[in-house]
UniProtKB/Swiss-Prot annotation:
UniProt-listed HAMAP family: SurE (MF_00060)
Key words, A-Z: Cytoplasm, Hydrolase, Metal-binding, Nucleotide-binding
Cited InterPro entries: SurE, SurE-like_Pase/nucleotidase, SurE-like_sf
EC primary class: hydrolase
Gene: surE
Positions with a binding annotation for a divalent metal cation: D11, D12, S42, N90
Record note on cofactor: Binds 1 divalent metal cation per subunit.
Protein name: 5'-nucleotidase SurE
GO cellular component: cytoplasm
Organism (species): Haloarcula marismortui (strain ATCC 43049 / DSM 3752 / JCM 8966 / VKM B-1809) (Halobacterium marismortui)
Length: 269
């Protein structure tokens, strides 16, 4: 492929240090246009709007909308010759199967796959306990060095190598650069899930206990999972598919065959 046209988005907002770090890296291997939210849109999943306002920006376009809005607007109106969509770099990791539908960063990559455009989501792990104030954790442009390096390398090599003939998108998670040089390893999303909730009067507080285990380096995730790789100081790359499909389901077929729409939906004897 000649120099690719790359659409860059994120969910932290177009002014974020992570997006700028990845923009600078990708600009060495492609023609990059940022189409990113004007404000922070973290954890909005694939929320979509009917209409968005777009402002010109030195890096491309600032969109008053969600990451998925940015991808749709970008691919269909603003950067219609896009060869690759990159989302990130997110300030904070997106690890495990359970975050894939929550993350605005990952959701932007998923949105791109429905346009048959290869995509990558990239995030940076910041060690912090859940009871700490995540917003107070500093992450400047230099902290994203490993994430930007890995993203640039994959953007330069993955398409021509046929990677996206076997998957729809890549979910990349890198450690902070302060941990030193990081090897790259191919992973699968961890299935560990430790959400819980505590009620105090009218308030219910939700906790994700996994972050505490990660900060302590005490996780049960086996080798080969994304979370294990990042805690061990490696760049995790998970090749994923977007459409939710299933195998033929005989048990459900049997139930569906007994459904009679004229009897209130009760199954026949």
């Amino acid at each position: 492929m000649d120099e690719p046209t790359i659409l860059l988005t994120n969910d932290d907002g177009i002014e974020s240090a992570g997006l700028r770090a990845v923009y600078d890296g990708l600009s060495t291997v492609g023609d990059v246009t940022a189409v990113a939210p004007a404000e922070d849109q973290s954890a909005v999943g694939r929320a979509i709007s009917h209409e968005v306002t777009v402002h010109e920006h030195e890096l491309g376009y600032a969109v008053e909308g969600t990451p998925s809005d940015c991808v749709v607007a970008g691919l269909e109106a603003l950067v219609t010759d896009t060869d690759l969509v990159v989302a990130g770099c997110n300030r904070g990791a997106n690890l495990g199967a359970y975050v894939l539908g929550r993350s605005g960063t990952v959701s932007a990559a998923v949105e791109a796959t429905f346009f048959d455009v290869p995509a990558m989501a990239v995030s940076m792990y910041i060690p912090v306990r859940e009871d700490a104030a995540f917003a107070d954790i500093e992450a400047n442009g230099d902290s994203y060095r490993e994430a930007a390096k890995a993203t640039t390398y994959l953007a330069d090599h993955a398409v021509d190598a046929g990677v996206f003939e076997q998957c729809d998108y890549l979910n990349i998670n890198a450690p902070v650069a302060e941990w030193g040089d990081a090897q790259m390893t191919v992973t699968r999303p961890s299935h560990l899930y430790e959400m819980d909730a505590e009620q105090d009067g009218d308030a219910v507080t939700l906790h994700d206990r996994i972050w505490e285990h990660m900060a302590d380096g005490d996780i049960p995730d086996p080798e080969g999972t994304d979370r294990r790789a990042v805690v061990d100081g490696k760049v995790s790359v998970s090749p994923l598919t977007a459409p939710h499909t299933t195998e033929h389901h005989e048990a459900l077929d049997a139930i569906a065959e007994t459904y009679e729409p004229d009897d209130g939906g009760e199954a026949a004897d």
